Amino acid sequence: ANINLVTGAHYVPQIIEALDMARRNGLDIPVVYNSSGYEKTETLKLLEGYVDIYLPDLKYLDPELAQKFSYAPDYVQAAKAAIGEMVRQTGKCEFGEDGYIRKGTIVRHLILPGHTGNSIKALRYLHETYGEDIYISIMNQYTPVRKFVEFKELNRKVTKREYEKVLDAAVDMGIQNGFIQEGETASESFIPDFD
């Protein structure tokens, strides 16, 4: 069991207040902060001592891709700083006797079709910077939900060959603390119905 906060930056004061109250009343399970990685370090510093596990994304290591797909030319700089703050707070990943993570940072990276170079750069940066102190989740679940006119390369799923290329690079880098996806994960059945 855990408390999973998803994209909660705009509620940090309320989160802190609620967690203080819950802990006074006996809350004793890990708090997980699930994030795009595009966070201000000032906000994350407020969460020190409140969050046990950070789950940020590192979407891009190429500022041009960050601008092209997310209109965020500062994404790389912001995400690097945010992940650095998260790891500073949590330290090396720790697991309980049950095998579940109790403390640490797991960085997720979603491979985009046609952009394995970005993925390999992202993995290299994470591994060279944090080594085995973090876990890296290498995801192949990109699912196009509509046809893009402006981004034609995003109109398809990641191929098996692309995913294997990134996984092979991770192995060659010596990444040991990681998660991979097997089977068919790029399907609309994995996307919540928001209607």
Predicted features along the sequence, with ranges:
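Conserved AdoMet/S-adenosylmethionine-binding subsite of the radical SAM
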Residues: 1-152
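General structural signal for secondary-structure boundaries
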Residues: 40, 75, 156-159, 195
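Conserved N-terminal glycine/acidic-rich loop preference
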Residues: 96-99, 105, 147-177
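Conserved beta-strand segments of alpha/beta enzyme cores
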Residues: 135, 176-179
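Conserved beta-strand termini and adjacent loop/short-helix elements that scaffold enzyme active sites
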Residues: 139, 180-183
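Radical SAM enzyme core and accessory elements
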Residues: 182-195
